[in-house]
């Protein structure tokens, strides 16, 4: 079995490297496979005021961790990382990184180029403070530099979680103006555009959990229409709406007010959130029949673009200690691959993979510790051998490279993963 896996890994490696482009075309969304990029990890060596943000509640320990997966940091200089007090891997200290370090972000983008990946949707949070924005600007600057250095494309994706009903829309508009006028994001040569306008994604409107504004669909539509056509020309965008999974039927995770249908129809691109909506391979196929295909038919009728979201697996035990460990197994990549195949077979021409660096919910696609012995001795860790397979740390980058090539029209995407341990 291991010989079969190694041979398949070699095939994937060669084809992924061959697919690497010097510069991704930033003038169109069509054919793109984009990752969500959190960029929210911090550590004291990079930012004494930031602490161990998103790694742990306080100093990392078995009791305080909020991540289940440990990144493979073997390619990073120790000077660019933070040693974790009291955590070890064998007889050596364990390390973590900060996205405020430009070299860390550059390494991530170098991986994207090496494996032929298109780029990222950079997460930006409306519900934060002015300090949060300033810290986000540091990471954004790093991303802009890394994009320039590697030819990967990027676009902003606002997460409105925690936004206030009466202020979030104005905050978003003001911040977008700031990004255009001051940060000059849309003037960057690799900022993603579509039909001559910069791409902007807004995630969270329409969710029925009461935690994501606005409550009134008319307010959502007003914001969408301002961004698409009502704003001064320099602020107008091709709009991606990060919507509930059941946006079309207004059920389950979606707000039920019928007015939301008009809000969704106003969006240039619909990107439904699917994390945790299915857990097994049969459920993935049922999702294609019951959701993907009807969604695509509806959007095609309305002249809109469909951007499905796929994910490699899910676990957030350390973040939510009452939850199970590894409740949505990765199945050696088969779970991710089948979602990509189904999206392509249904007719989708663009795709989002959640996420590049999300180790809190174990959806990370970047290099991850392969074996338990490569993660810290202290605490629970979900490593790539959890499914009984001997996988390299870059396995999911290689799979993403193959998926990207398929969406570029460079290769077919078969229903079965080409590598079986």
Please provide the spans of the model-predicted regions.
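N-terminal secretory signal peptides that target proteins for export/translocation
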Residues: 1-3
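Hydrophobic helical h-region of N-terminal Sec-dependent signal peptides
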Residues: 6-18
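Glycan-processing catalytic domains of CAZymes
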Residues: 21-421
